[in-house]
Structures are given as C-alpha cells and as structure tokens.
Amino acid sequence: MRGAVLRLGAARGQLRLEQEHLLEDIAHVRQRLDDEARQRQEAEAAARALARFAQEAEAARVELQKKAQALQEECGYLRRHHQEEAQAEARDALKCDVTSALREIRAQLEGHAVQSTLQQEEWFRVRLDRLSEAAKVNTDAM
C-alpha cells in the first residue's frame, strides 16, 4: 500500500509538471496568435493604404488625361483660329510679311504649350511625391 501511495504521489507530481508545461504551451500559442493577429491587421492596413494610393494615382492619371485632351483641343482651336487670322491678314495686307508673323504666332503657341506642360508636370510631381511619402510611411509602418 505504501508503494501505491508513493506511485500515486509520483504520478501526481508528474501530472503537475505536465500541467505546467501545458500552461506554458498555451501561453506561447496565445502569444503567437496575438502576434499573428497584429501582423494581419498591419498587412490589411497596408493593403488598404496601397489600394487608396492606387485609386488616387488612377484619379490623377485620369485628371491629367483630361487636361492633356483639353490642351490638345485648345491647340487645335488655336491652330484653326491662327490659320483664319493669317488668311484674313494675307488678304487684307499683301505687303505684310506672312512668314515672320507665322513664326511669331507659332513661337507664342509653343511657349504657351511648354508653360502648360511644365505646370502639369510640376503638379503631377508634387502629387506623386505626396503619394510616395504616404506609401513610404505605410511601408515603414509595416
């Protein structure tokens, strides 16, 4: 009987030891679960930020396309208008130097086109820099 009591005591000690190990394993698994949940939330936040970035970039692209189309239409209008004016001036004043007038008008049109293009490029660079900073912040946050 004494041997049975000793065996039961040893078994009890072994069970307590196993229980402690199981509690440690449970705590470790919970910590891993918490870490993975946090990482998943961070990844989801980064994915949302990238989706917003993509939407903003697409909106900027569409806006720039609209501006480019408007500039092309304006350029076509200016060309037509210029041609009409040049023809009227040629009829009114044959002595006028048509070549120099056309060069001057063309230079003005090119100057306006270059200025407009530069303004668009600057706007796009600023917007792209802002979006890149936001993406970098989100990437750093991950």
Swiss-Prot record:
Q: Does the keyword Transcription apply?
A: no
Annotated coiled-coil segments of the chain: 26-74
Tell me the compartments it is located in: Cytoplasm, Cytoskeleton; Cell projection, Axon
PROSITE patterns in alphabetical order? IF_ROD_2 (PS51842)
Q: Which domain of life is it from?
A: Eukaryota
Briefly state the modifications made to the protein after translation.
There are a number of repeats of the tripeptide K-S-P, NFH is phosphorylated on a number of the serines in this motif. It is thought that phosphorylation of NFH results in the formation of interfilament cross bridges that are important in the maintenance of axonal caliber.
IF rod domain location is 1-142
Keywords attached to this entry: Cell projection, Coiled coil, Cytoplasm, Cytoskeleton, Intermediate filament, Phosphoprotein
Question: Could you state one GO cellular component term attached to this entry?
Answer: axon
Write one Pfam family the protein is assigned to: Filament
What family does the entry list? Belongs to the intermediate filament family.
The record's subunit annotation is: Forms heterodimers with NEFL; which can further hetero-oligomerize (in vitro). Forms heterodimers with INA (in vitro).
Role of this protein: Neurofilaments usually contain three intermediate filament proteins: NEFL, NEFM, and NEFH which are involved in the maintenance of neuronal caliber. NEFH has an important function in mature axons that is not subserved by the two smaller NF proteins. May additionally cooperate with the neuronal intermediate filament proteins PRPH and INA to form neuronal filamentous networks.
**Protein name (record):** Neurofilament heavy polypeptide
